[in-house]
A protein has these predicted regions:
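Short intrinsically disordered, low-complexity coil segments enriched in acidic
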Residues: 1-3, 70, 138, 225, ...
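Nucleotide-sugar donor-binding/catalytic module of glycosyltransferases
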Residues: 2-223
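Membrane-interface aromatic/basic loop that binds lipid-linked glycans or pyrophosphate carriers
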Residues: 6, 254-305
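A structural preference for long, well-packed, hydrophobic secondary-structure segments
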Residues: 21-23, 74, 157, 184, ...
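A broadly tuned preference for mixed-charge, low-complexity surface segments
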Residues: 178-183, 239-253, 289-304
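Catalytic core of nucleotide-sugar-dependent glycosyltransferases
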Residues: 202-208, 214-237, 249, 253-267
Length: 305
C-alpha cells in the first residue's frame, strides 16, 4: 500500500520520451523546445541509446540543470528499444514522443493538455506536423473512420500525438523492425475508445538523410509492406493503391513473390498517374503493374553510353 501511495504521488501529468543516438548537433534544439513549453508537471526522459558521440554528456548536463529531465543510459538497441525503455520509466498520465532530430512548436503541449483535460474520453490526440500535415478539430469513435478519412496510414508516426498512458499497458514498439510505427500505431488505435485530431499546436519534422528509413532498401520496404498487410486495418481503394505502390517497389528491388492480393478499384477515385495505375490494376493485375513500374524506372535511368 505504501509503495502504491508513493507511486501515485510521484506521477507526472506528461511524460515526453526522446530517444538519443548520434544527434549532438540537433539535440539542444529538440530538448530546449520541450523544456520551454511551460509545463512544470512534466518529465522529459532522454534515452541515450549507447550514443558514441557527446550526447550522453549533454543529456547528463540537462538532468543536472533541470529536475524535470531524467536520463537513461543503455546499450544500443535501436529506436524501438529506446522508446520502450522510456515507456517503462514514464510515470505520466499522458505520454508523447519526440525524435531528437525534430522539435516542438512553442506552446503546443499546454494547449494539447488543456484539450485532454476538457475531454477525459480522449485516449489519443493527434496534432499537426508543420508544413506537412494539417488537421481539423474532429473526434472519431470508430477506428475505421479515422484510419481512412484522415489517411492515417500515411502518418502513423509515434511523435505528433498525445496518448493516455493506459494505451501502452500491453503494447510496445517491435525491436528489430524498421518502420516500427506502422506496426505499433494500429494496435494503439484498437486499444483506444475515442481518437481526436486538432488543428492546434505543431511538430517540426526535420528529415534526416542518414536515417534508416531515409535509406530504406528493398528488405526495409518489404518490412514496411508486411507491417501494412498484418495490421488488420480496413482498406479502401486509395489505401490499396498506396500498398500497390509499396508492393511494386518491393518486387522491383527484391524479386520477392507478390504478397498483395489482387483487387478491383473504382477508377473514379483517382486522377493523373494514379488513375493510370488503377486502370492497369483493373485490366492487367498487380503483377503487370509491378512489371510496368520496373520498366518505367529502367527507361528513366541515364544511359552509360
Amino acid at each position: 500500500m505504501i509503495l502504491q501511495i508513493i507511486s501515485y504521488l510521484c506521477r507526472m501529468l506528461l511524460s515526453v520520451i526522446i530517444p538519443v543516438y548520434r544527434v549532438e548537433h540537433t539535440l539542444q534544439r529538440c530538448v530546449e523546445s520541450v523544456l520551454s513549453q511551460g509545463v512544470d508537471d512534466m518529465e522529459v526522459i532522454l534515452v541515450d541509446d549507447g550514443s558514441p558521440d557527446n550526447c550522453p554528456v549533454l543529456c547528463d548536463g540537462w538532468a543536472e540543470k533541470d529536475a524535470r529531465v531524467k536520463v537513461i543510459h543503455k546499450d544500443n538497441g535501436g529506436l524501438s528499444d529506446a522508446r520502450n525503455a522510456g515507456i517503462e520509466m514514464a510515470t505520466g498520465d499522458y505520454l508523447t514522443f519526440v525524435d531528437s532530430d525534430d522539435y516542438v512548436k512553442d506552446d503546443t503541449y499546454p494547449a494539447l493538455l488543456q484539450i485532454m483535460a476538457e475531454h477525459p474520453d480522449y485516449d489519443l490526440l493527434e496534432y499537426p506536423i508543420v508544413n506537412r500535415l494539417s488537421l481539423e478539430d474532429r473526434t472519431y469513435q470508430q477506428t475505421q473512420e479515422y484510419w481512412l478519412d484522415t489517411k492515417a496510414y500515411l502518418h502513423t508516426y509515434a511523435w505528433n500525438k498525445i496518448y493516455r498512458r493506459h494505451l501502452f499497458d500491453d503494447i510496445r514498439f517491435p525491436v528489430g523492425k524498421i518502420f516500427e510505427d506502422v506496426y505499433t500505431f494500429p494496435q494503439l488505435l484498437r486499444a483506444a475508445t475515442t481518437i481526436a485530431t486538432t488543428q492546434i499546436g505543431g511538430y517540426h519534422y526535420c528529415p534526416n538523410p542518414q536515417s534508416i528509413t531515409a535509406q530504406a532498401d528493398g528488405a526495409a520496404l518489404s518490412m514496411l509492406l508486411d507491417a501494412h498487410l498484418q495490421n488488420g486495418m480496413p482498406m479502401d481503394d486509395i489505401y490499396y493503391l498506396h500498398l500497390a505502390n509499396i508492393q511494386s517497389d518491393v518486387w522491383e528491388r527484391t524479386g520477392q513473390p507478390i504478397r498483395l492480393a489482387a483487387r478491383q478499384v473504382d477508377i473514379a477515385h483517382f486522377h493523373g498517374k494514379d488513375k493510370l495505375k488503377a486502370i492497369i490494376l483493373n485490366t492487367l493485375g498487380i503483377k503487370k503493374l509491378c512489371q510496368t513500374n520496373k520498366l518505367i524506372h529502367l527507361l528513366k535511368k541515364p544511359s552509360r553510353w
